[in-house]
Amino acid sequence: MVVPDLDDVTYDLEVDGEQVRRTLHRRVFERGGWATVAIAFEERASDGSWKPAKLALIRLQRVHEAWKKHAALTMAGTDALALGRALVEWGAAFDGNVDE
């Protein structure tokens, strides 16, 4: 995947005119020549209902005048929530307030 702008990174998917994956939330984290796009999404089950939400993390690198996909990771919603809770617990470390 190569896109000219980070706004062009999408995760929606249609098959034969039917939406089978839809984006619920999206956030871009950009620093220097690297960006991470976090996307909460749902996929359609075979019975037509929507499955529980998942998280996709897409890592992109700036190459000349475009963004090139470098890596991607998909997590179940429960795993994404567990990761979020862990990050909150570790918050002091990210703020530089770790007791030694």
Model region roles, listed by residue range:
Residues 1-100:
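Positively charged, low-complexity terminal tracts
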